[in-house]
Design a protein with these regions (language model features):
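Short, solvent-exposed loop/turn segments enriched in Ser/Thr/Gly
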Residues: 197-201, 238, 317, 375-376
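Extended C-terminal subregions enriched in glycine
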Residues: 353-387
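C-terminal reverse transcriptase regions that engage the nucleic-acid substrate
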Residues: 243-245
Length: 445
């Protein structure tokens, strides 16, 4: 594996996640619409959010921060699995790098823009709306104060309140009698953090992926967040949250139900902080399929693995894991964790094991010599339920050392509870199945 000495690679080239539910009828006539994705460290987001005090991107502290952030995602999943009513949602803002990916969205008529955090672990797309205590401005890194748009149904001519008797409202939501509108409350994992408001129908402005590009006003349902509490008052989600989960209130599901797209989306994470999310992406012709495990009360993107192959070592072992593009690394409990890391370590013969005086998030790291420009690691592939194999394209991360030189680490973290496949994996979800294919491009836009 070759690496340029003047770069810090987060996951080598491009990381992609495809997520979709394809309806039984033909989707050939459906369109594909997209939005740009911006990393927390990208120039676009840095214009809004101060990165002073954040760990240097690609450093060991940076990966430690992402791992800490992932632990919060895992805690959310455990709380959701144990819940018998409404799921506990993902947001927990105590860690500075928790929100790593954002998108600038345009909503309403006339259109206003909002910088929203992306989350595959929650469903509702909500914006601060007609609120007295929400965040209205930010101090940018340029020392300028930036005003944020606050959504209001009364100023958007295309808006319409969702009535209490609407099918969108459902039995799990309340009713605002004063407004005669469907009420909602989303409670997040962070202490006393929630958003409460009403549901509104409006338009989301999207661009097609065709050339020349066409602009489309896509009808959606969003949360008008009247009351924000906890970390949302500290600007943790800045200007709203864009849920990408499975529920029918999520934007991918709404676009499909309106007949605008196949019920799918792909997320491409580029190495330069700029990526792309495409709604209606149907993947590649050569992709392979594995069925989802949908027995949970609150379904997630959960699959079964039946075999692990690390280089020449093959182990028959069945376990389940959830795909989550919002999680940075892969977390496995035993015996799957030990099978992979011990087999990987036994086949690394050219580089010495890295021994740190303090505990690092990765247990298996190796030191590269000052003159070394490449390294070779054993191939890792997983056999999924149904028999198809998935080849992991980037099992390691490259980390610069403070005193000079590099180490590379197997980017698998030991879990004491659930298994999660992080965003170094590429999947597409189709007809209640996950589809996966090799990543062959580094260009997200």
């Amino acid at each position: 594996m070759y690496f340029p000495k003047n770069s810090v690679l987060e996951g080598f080239l491009m990381l992609t996640a495809f997520v979709c539910w394809i309806n039984a009828y033909s989707s050939e006539a459906f369109g594909t619409f997209g939005l740009d994705i911006h990393h927390r460290y990208s120039d676009t987001v840095k214009d809004f959010l101060d990165v002073d005090g954040l760990p240097e991107k690609g450093s060991l502290d940076y990966y430690a921060s992402m791992a800490h952030r992932d632990q919060l995602f895992k805690a959310r999943r455990l709380a959701t699995a144990a819940a018998t009513t409404s799921p506990i949602l993902s947001f927990l803002g105590a860690n500075q790098t928790f929100r790593l990916h954002y998108s600038v969205v345009s909503v309403g008529t006339p259109a206003l823009t909002y910088l929203v955090a992306l989350d595959t672990g929650s469903d509702l797309f909500w914006l601060p709306c007609d609120c007295k205590s929400c965040v209205r401005s930010l101090n940018a890194t340029s020392s300028q104060r930036l005003d944020l748009h606050i959504y209001s149904p009364s100023t958007s001519s295309s808006s319409k309140l969702v009535p209490c008797n609407s099918t969108t409202c459902g039995r799990t939501r309340g009713c605002s009698v004063r407004r005669n509108a469907c009420a909602y409350q989303e409670v997040y994992l962070s202490t006393n953090t929630s958003t409460t408001g009403i549901l509104v129908d409006d338009v989301l402005h999207l661009g097609t992926d065709a050339t020349p590009q066409k602009l489309v006003e896509a009808p959606i349902t969003l949360g008008c967040g009247i009351i924000q509490t906890g970390d949302f008052l500290d600007g943790a989600a800045v200007n709203g949250l864009f849920g990408l989960g499975m529920d029918n209130v999520s934007v991918p599901s709404i676009l499909s139900n309106k007949g605008l797209t196949a019920n799918s989306f792909s997320m491409c994470f580029g190495p330069d902080g700029l990526g792309r999310i495409n709604f209606g992406d149907k993947g590649s012709p050569g992709q392979k399929v594995t069925p989802f495990n949908l027995e949970q009360l609150h379904p997630t993107y959960n699959i079964t693995v039946t075999r692990i192959a690390v280089g020449k070592n093959v182990t028959e072992l069945e376990f389940t894991a959830a795909f989550d593009s919002g999680t940075s690394f892969t977390y496995l409990n035993d015996p799957a964790y030990s099978v992979i890391v011990e087999s990987f370590n036994s086949q690394i013969t050219n580089e010495p094991r890295y021994r740190s005086r303090t505990r690092t998030i990765f247990d298996y790291c190796y030191v590269l010599s000052a003159t070394q420009n490449n390294y070779t690691v054993p191939m890792l592939n997983l056999t999924m339920g149904g028999g198809n194999e998935y080849y992991v394209t980037a099992p390691t991360v490259l980390i610069p050392q403070k005193g000079g030189g590099y180490v590379y680490c197997l980017a698998v973290v030991k879990s004491e509870d659930i298994n999660i496949m992080g965003r170094e994996y590429s999947i597409e979800i189709m007809n209640k199945s996950a589809c996966f294919s090799p990543i062959v491009s580094v260009n997200c836009v």
